[in-house]
Curated annotation (Swiss-Prot):
PANTHER family: THIOL PEROXIDASE (PTHR43110:SF1). Thiol-specific peroxidase that catalyzes the reduction of hydrogen peroxide and organic hydroperoxides to water and alcohols, respectively. Plays a role in cell protection against oxidative stress by detoxifying peroxides. Gene3D superfamilies: Glutaredoxin. The lineage of its organism: Bacteria, Bacillati, Bacillota, Bacilli, Bacillales. Belongs to the peroxiredoxin family. Tpx subfamily. It comes from Bacillus subtilis (strain 168). Homodimer. This is Thiol peroxidase. Disulfide bonds join 60-94, 60-94. It comes from the Bacteria. Induction: By superoxide. The active site is a conserved redox-active cysteine residue, the peroxidatic cysteine (C(P)), which makes the nucleophilic attack on the peroxide substrate. The peroxide oxidizes the C(P)-SH to cysteine sulfenic acid (C(P)-SOH), which then reacts with another cysteine residue, the resolving cysteine (C(R)), to form a disulfide bridge. The disulfide is subsequently reduced by an appropriate electron donor to complete the catalytic cycle. In this atypical 2-Cys peroxiredoxin, C(R) is present in the same subunit to form an intramolecular disulfide. The keyword RNA-binding does not apply. SUPFAM superfamilies: Thioredoxin-like.
């Protein structure tokens, strides 16, 4: 199990840590229009999943903007940002900030993604900052659990992993 801190204090992650080589576990999240989306909907394309605690914080804002910029250069790759924010808040933020290459998804309903990927912070009901890259069959080829949730993830490594898979 990954161990992380939030503002310097240890927190409990619920679920099983996902590792490179694992088949990504199934989950269900909500789109901004309240439609369900699952792992099955992501298969068939290389997928980057950027996980953030809340879209309305500085690092999460910067992380989502960075992956939106990178998504424009990647070609046929799914790029998602998942948080526990309400879908309406995600849609408002994306609209206000011109985010159109990354699709935001909400895990607020039942934390299905958070538990499946081992990123659900029990004490805060938020998701831990992390990044995953899946191949077109849903196999994990990159996984990063950021050790301090208020820090930035590595941006270059997941982008490189996704580029290596695009044919």
């Amino acid at each position: 199990m990954a161990e992380i801190t939030f503002k310097g204090g240890p927190v409990t992650l619920v679920g099983q840590e996902v590792k490179v080589g694992d088949q990504a576990p199934d989950f269900t999240v909500l789109t901004n229009s309240l439609e369900e989306k699952s792992l099955a909907d992501m298969k068939g394309k290389v997928t980057i999943i950027s996980v953030i605690p809340s879209i309305d914080t500085g690092v999460c804002d910067a992380q989502t903007r960075r992956f939106n910029e990178e998504a424009a250069k990647l070609g046929d790759v799914n790029v998602y940002t998942i948080s526990a924010d309400l879908p309406f808040a995600q849609a408002r933020w994306c609209g206000a900030n011109g985010i159109d290459k990354v699709e935001t998804l909400s895990d607020h309903r039942d934390m299905s993604f958070g538990e499946a990927f081992g990123v659900y912070i029990k004490e805060l009901r938020l998701l831990a900052r992390s990044v995953f890259v899946l191949d077109e069959n849903g196999k994990v080829v990159y996984a990063e659990y950021v050790s301090e949730a208020t820090n930035h993830p590595n941006y270059e490594k997941p982008i490189e992993a996704a580029k290596a898979l695009v044919k």
